[in-house]
């Protein structure tokens, strides 16, 4: 048993990546065996759970005239879904939120192309991530003794085929870390963006409500136009270059922007418009492409589709209120912090 004070837990996801998926072939195996059955192609197993969670959230505010859409719907939905999938108690969701915020601190408050935190911020993040590690290790211990139908229990039992062995505590913590950092805020922001887009275009809301088969196309187009993660990676130029008429000197730091690629007019006709008939709707880079495509894209897409089907079952129209003020999270994430809406029930 690894000590809960082992500092190597501090970067559990990075350790897990180095151990379980350091190259392309192992990355594919990791997805295929460890995450695909839960949040990838196998995400459909959670359809009933997501539908129930969605309707319960709507129940909480359906009899009101207004809803703060982020805190009362877009945020708690992926929190509930991911807790159920991983096998964490729902009453611990405030803790998961706290630790999830700690995980993304560099992307929100970090400075420079390396997203560096101050010494104080780094110490705060390390303390919070140590709490997360201790929490997951305790859950892993519980699941080994009393396995349930959840992802942590599965990870304690599975034999990882490339290495023909069981996963270590370190590696399970790393997988759980990836599920939290990748499965909460991104889906939250996507659903909130979609609400804004539908309020801005009420005719589109009517069109989707009348033909629910179009909701999936809308989800893909909204993910393309308003990617929750605008970019992550940076590169340094090794020589002077000109890019679209702009001189880029040697040694310049470039930020790779998925959000910009998604609205490239050379790739997408009328790129800023939602086109439900657009060919190759999933061609955008919001979940990346290739063997490193986001492992949780299946569960995120499912949540978004179910969310809007359930909302349209019960809501005839959403509108902004006189007090609606839209502010976005700083950093590389395109995230709406608050979205006050009024609505008309069916």
List each model region and its residues:
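Cytochrome P450
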Residues: 1-346
